[in-house]
Amino acid sequence: MFQLTATPASALADEPVHIRVMGLAPLQVVTLMASLKDEKGNLFQSRAFYRANEAGELDLEQDPALGGDFVGVHPMGLFWSLKPEKPFGRLLKLEVMNSPFWITLDLYDSPRASLEVQRWFSSPGVQRLMIREGRVRGALFLPPGEGPFPGIIDLFGGIGGLLEYRAGLLAAHGFAALALAYFAYDDLPNQLQEVDLDYFEEAANLLLAHPKIQKPGIGVISVSKGAEIGLAMACYLKQVVATVCINGRNAIFEVPLRYRDLVLTPIPSFLERMEVNASGAVRLRHCMGDPRDELNQQSVLPIEKSQGQILFIIGEDDECLNSRDYAEQALDQLQSHGRSNGRMLLYPGAGHLIEPPYGPLCYGSRTRGFPLPLLWGGDPVLHAAAQEQAWREILKFFRQHLAILIFPDSQSS
């Protein structure tokens, strides 16, 4: 009997799906296609060609793709190789709580079959609370139960606005996660004119004041410009005890940072060093001033003041920033002060936008404030492997350094 199956058909977006086909002709070659429309109607598609075994069966966990968007054994390849129909599209889940991404799997040419898989960014029982207290704007995701839960602030970068999908997944794993907006949202400034660290301290205090949040410290997960801010929080805010910085910088760039009476002026950028590739996208990697330059020392973040643990997640094919160099400078700075509270995980072939696993690589996209698309980099196969491994390491890091009371076995995990 012919059958196309995907198990589980409904799951968290960071869970793998087992795809199988039965009832084909022996050694038959077939095409599998995945397609998805985001909430704005943008289409993303992938496909791969497979040969059934002598029993007429196909199992993506052990059978290699012969061609298409990837080659070899990649059980989740149809998911992470999804590509936008329109150039420079980025797949972002906007509505986290009430609707999944629906991915359609199609088998053809003969026989034809189709099924749908649901990919959720939150789990049953998770609560979403809109936060509009004082100056703080965001969305707090609470796991089911009374808690207390380890708290995490979630920061994205120059895209601005409020992105909630990573916070929703963190809540599904037992963390209370505050997706925090800091510009281009609600009544916040439309452009990032400065980084006001007092705002982020207000958010940390608000999170810790919630009755379901474990005290005395919180974590931060951050990427790109957000990771620059996340590192500043680790340096200056005693509330922050565990920080993940994904492809960020170790100094202040673009706009000044203010905290109480302190002002850090930004290191200048040199836009004349911009490179535009054949697709019309911009590579910014070589545009930044060097934090090691004596004139820029006042802009370097004092990482030696950080009291908590810091994990740098680095994609070595980052086309936006020389993120490995920045992380190495930060770790050297720690070591020169006799500190050992930071470490770096390097991922060859991974680009700038390292996301939760099984999401597609975004090699380049349009972003706020730039007239041309920006290059993020990444090799699809290596980037997918990096996202899977990095997410495991991030969850393990927060369980080890934040959630000891909640997950008593976490130090051995």
Where do the PLM segments sit?
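Primarily recognizes the serine-hydrolase "nucleophile elbow" in alpha/beta-hydrolase
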Residues: 161-165, 201-272, 283-295
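Catalytic active-site module of serine/aspartate enzymes centered on a nucleophile-bearing elbow/loop
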Residues: 360-413
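Ser/Thr-rich low-complexity repeats and stalk/linker segments
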Residues: 34-85
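Cap/lid segment of the alpha/beta-hydrolase catalytic domain
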Residues: 135, 147-209, 216, 255-258, ...
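Short, solvent-exposed beta-strand-terminating loops
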Residues: 251-259, 343-366
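Serine-hydrolase catalytic core
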Residues: 281-353, 386-392, 399-400, 405
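Glycine-rich His-Gly loop
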Residues: 154-158, 224, 315-316
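N-terminal cap/lid segment of alpha/beta-hydrolase-fold proteins
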Residues: 2-12, 17-26, 43-46, 51-53, ...
